[in-house]
Amino acid sequence: MESVERKSESSYLGMRNMQPEQRLSLDPPRLRSTPQDELHDLLCVGFGPASLAIAIALHDALDPRLNKSASNIHAQPKICFLERQKQFAWHSGMLVPGSKMQISFIKDLATLRDPRSSFTFLNYLHQKGRLIHFTNLSTFLPARLEFEDYMRWCAQQFSDVVAYGEEVVEVIPGKSDPSSSVVDFFTVRSRNVETGEISARRTRKVVIAIGGTAKMPSGLPQDPRIIHSSKYCTTLPALLKDKSKPYNIAVLGSGQSAAEIFHDLQKRYPNSRTTLIMRDSAMRPSDDSPFVNEIFNPERVDKFYSQSAAERQRSLLADKATNYSVVRLELIEEIYNDMYLQRVKNPDETQWQHRILPERKITRVEHHGPQSRMRIHLKSSKPESEGAANDVKETLEVDALMVATGYNRNAHERLLSKVQHLRPTGQDQWKPHRDYRVEMDPSKVSSEAGIWLQGCNERTHGLSDSLLSVLAVRGGEMVQSIFGEQLERAAVQGHQLRAML
């Protein structure tokens, strides 16, 4: 027994002493680049986590170790991803120091679909030489910085099929036979973000997965000092360069991002005055209790989709506390403790260095050039019917205003404006099926062509649609929906071959 233990220990030490670059790397990419002028099988607009999950699922479907029939797939899918950013990045503007993920690392881009995949978070740790060290953290919640690095590591495996720095501007229907009335491909036009050059690629199938765009309250002026939370870590340091200066900084919002920024500003600019402005009466904790968390289980999408529109809306409202305008309890407690210590020193809140102004809304912002501070006008967010006593009016003079008011998820409407006429008669908006393929008039569009939407289907697929929780499983569903017939043919061929042996 002792010799076995020593042998095991020796083997472990040998692996532990290997440098990360000596460890086994992933297999050669199973997705290969396609010449731009060729007709693609699939073109994905955007290469964030949603598209990355599709790439991983397709890679795994072509891996004979995971899919016995993969060796019968003779033609590699012709696929390309177009991404506006110059490299893979996930919420780079909100990689706040010390911030952690809000979901388990098991909900990575592969594990829930197939834990044997090479693209699991645990394999990432193994390849980086940190697996044993991570276990010592005793947590399921990695640092947000590390999880972004995990996704970047995954993305690097697909560099051959991603065109970075390409912003898609429109999708145009096309016909191989000009005399035909049926669309059988799409032309995706993109602009190079550096040169402005326009490129065009033809594809049978299109996935739109461009994520959200910054939502800014109406009435806020265009000013470089008014910054959306998505650009906090990338833009504010360049604007307020001297960390020792006594800046005045305001944050608008009551959700996780607003709370993280408000908390981080106090460390980043220790001599500054910070103010958190919110419509709500208080920060509210997110509900991540086990039973409630089951709404993010991948199989719950089926149940949600099968409901009527009215039932879906009721479900969204009932589950709002899991995701919208809520903050993790641990952070709320930290912020409250900081506020309390100020109260110990001075009971007059107006004199505090860091303040929270609940039940307020911004009515207007005066800005008279970069040399003078912006003036923010506030009033009560309560309905006027509740009395004039609540009509508090205040002004703040600030060097910067961080706006953490969420995201819009309707950018696909603009990209697909030239395809709208292909919707069924009387349909005034895109209607995704359960497999995320949008409904089109079959008399106008070939069954070989299609468009899929990702991350903008909350009203039909539930709260998890724009979140990481379902991406591993959904990536597999997308591959099945797009390439299912090809994969099934390969499976049949495999069964026939084995039957002959």
Curated annotation (Swiss-Prot):
Its cofactor is FAD. SUPFAM superfamilies: FAD/NAD(P)-binding domain. The keyword Flavoprotein applies. Disruption phenotype: Moderately reduced growth rate during iron starvation and in iron replete conditions. Only displays 1% of wild-type conidiospore production in iron-depleted and replete conditions. Completely attenuates virulence in a mouse model of invasive pulmonary aspergillosis. NADP(+) binds at residues 254-257, 279, 323-325. Homotetramer. This is L-ornithine N(5)-monooxygenase. The gene is sidA.
